[in-house]
Amino acid sequence: MTKTKEIIKTGWNLDSTYAHLPKQFFTIITPNPVSAPKLVILNEPLATVLGLDSEALQSKDSLEVLAGNRALEGALPLAQAYAGHQFGHFALLGDGRALLLGEQITPSGERFDLQLKGSGPTPYSRGGDGRASLGPMLREYIISEAMHALGIATTRSLAVVTTGEAVIRETDLPGAILTRVAASHLRVGTFEYIAKWGTVQELRALADYTLQRHFPEVGAVENPYLSLVQEVIKGQAALIAKWQLVGFIHGVMNTDNMTISGETIDYGPCAFMDSYDPKTVFSSIDRQGRYAYGNQPHIAGWNLARFAETLLPLLHEDQDEAVKLAQDEISRFIQLYHSHWLTGMRAKLGIFNEEVQDESLIEELLKMMEKNHADYTNTFRALSFETLEGTALFGTTEFAQWHELWRARLNRQQESKDASQQLMQNSNPGVIPRNHRVEAALDAAVKQGDYSVMEQLLNVLSKPYAHSPEQAEYCMPPAPSNRPYRTFCGT
């Protein structure tokens, strides 16, 4: 392929190591071109991280790449095969509307998957058109970048391109393609697919590839596959704790949406909790509350058990011993998660050291928040700045008694009051992607072609711990007329 000056200048440096795995793992895809691609948003800071030139990315040649109209040298576009437990039921899945362009190698030697989401049908489309509409792609862009700013491991969004073509859902909608960036797209469901339909040799090849790509430091230990289980558990324990600490509800925690890298992936029906309630569910398809806020840690443990099951043939030649090894590791997940969560909750309350009664102090606050329908984010924000007024919770006798116990707890630690307050302000975001704010930005962009609302929202969300005056209006919870909020997967 002849390279243009624009392509050379852009900084594309693609490899396709995934294509070296057995052919059962993927299908090589010829991209489906679109008629009139247009770049509507570009993540310039992320482009810099990837070693890409933002100006050159906006050229016609690069636009053709981001739209799936053109392949790059070093790229071998493919759709990945995987399976998954969806709401507890096993299913054969795969990239039904996405293709992996390849792996961008940055100037520092890091490797990131570049995936086009909404790029057209694949052998795994299961009758779908393989396309995506603009609203859900912009939504993933907003929330994934907000998660990154919050310090939560996540896939990210490089660009959104409109296709100039309509996609048919309940009505005709503008088509779009998102360029998703990830440490990799290896999922628990990837291992489930090979464990179900592959050989032990293919399973070993996948595990070895994963170790080399994500955990090279444990590759030489006595039982590297047990170490793989341990590392994935550690990553997910830290991730789910961070979700809980900011009130994030994923909405579709199927095993195909749990990454091996420990990144959050798939922002279809997700949302952030307003009033604190462990039973909060936003997804329109989660009618039984399987993936409710309070269930997320337990579901993560269930998913990890499915992951460990796939590796049983590699853990030990004796099946009973392999099962015991896996069970021992899975049993540690909730304890590990809880340790991360408790440390994070202490920080949200300005607590530096550990005392036995800390957990009961935290749980008592959460019970009062639930009883009084207190806003989760704003309650901790108010505690951080000692602005304890204007809500039902702060006017109760229960809270006054709790507040006295909390102040006494802070006085028992060596750190100063100012240090505690700074810890709280660094641990409690002032702004989150409030559901009504996200919807307002999407309405302006999709219905009116006005991206200024979205750009302003992205700017505010990029500094969640700044607590600046211009963020004040974005801290407001939704009006009662905007509740209850429902999300849809957008597929």
From Swiss-Prot:
Task: Please give the Pfam families that the UniProt record associates with this protein.
Answer: SelO
Keyword Acyltransferase attributed:
no
Q: Which residues bind Mg(2+)?
A: 257, 266
One MF term in GO for this entry?
magnesium ion binding
Q: Does the keyword ATP-binding apply?
A: yes
List, from the UniProt record, the residues annotated as the active site of this protein. 256 (proton acceptor)
Enzyme Commission number, as recorded: 2.7.7.-, 2.7.7.108
Q: Which UniProt keywords apply?
A: ATP-binding, Magnesium, Manganese, Metal-binding, Nucleotide-binding, Nucleotidyltransferase, Transferase
Positions of ATP binding: 94, 96-97, 117, 129-130, 180, 187, 266
Checking InterPro entries in the record gives:
SelO
The coenzyme or cofactor needed here is: Mg(2+); Mn(2+)
Catalysed reaction(s)? L-seryl-[protein] + ATP = 3-O-(5'-adenylyl)-L-seryl-[protein] + diphosphate; L-threonyl-[protein] + ATP = 3-O-(5'-adenylyl)-L-threonyl-[protein] + diphosphate; L-tyrosyl-[protein] + ATP = O-(5'-adenylyl)-L-tyrosyl-[protein] + diphosphate; L-histidyl-[protein] + UTP = N(tele)-(5'-uridylyl)-L-histidyl-[protein] + diphosphate
Please describe what this protein does.
Nucleotidyltransferase involved in the post-translational modification of proteins. It can catalyze the addition of adenosine monophosphate (AMP) or uridine monophosphate (UMP) to a protein, resulting in modifications known as AMPylation and UMPylation.
Task: Give the UniProt family note.
Answer: Belongs to the SELO family.
HAMAP family linked to this entry: YdiU_SelO (MF_00692)
Task: Return the PANTHER family for the record.
Answer: PROTEIN ADENYLYLTRANSFERASE SELO, MITOCHONDRIAL, SELENOPROTEIN O
| Protein name as annotated | Protein nucleotidyltransferase YdiU
